[in-house]
Amino acid sequence: MIVGLHAVLFTDDPVATRAFLQDTLGLEPVDAGGGWLIFAGPPAELAAHPAEGQPHHEVYLMCDDIHATVADLEAKGAEFVGSVVEQRWGLLTKLRLPGGGELPLYEPRHPSPLTS
């Protein structure tokens, strides 16, 4: 039986990325030993879409009010890549991760199993 969803962020600066997850995003960690922190995330949903090109995986953070969330995270020092843009499925922006890379953040405008 599936009991959860585990995502991994590969980063060039795991210490800074872990601090960002804990201090900026407010996620609660557990010490898994060996320098590993694993963070409790919010409830998750999993979607399967047709691939454009090679099959791949993506991780998005979801929020209920993207403009308020962006303002809150910016006040905590988060940096965003570009502005909020409207997609057919919701409002989207991307967080810049301290260890390199980006993490999309969106306000869904589609039915969700989390709210249905």
What are these regions (language model features)?
Residues 25-32, 79-83:
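Short secondary-structure junctions
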Residues 27-57, 95, 102-109:
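Conserved short beta-strand elements that form part of the metal-binding/catalytic scaffold
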Residues 17-22, 73, 100:
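Conserved active-site tyrosine of GNAT-family acetyltransferases
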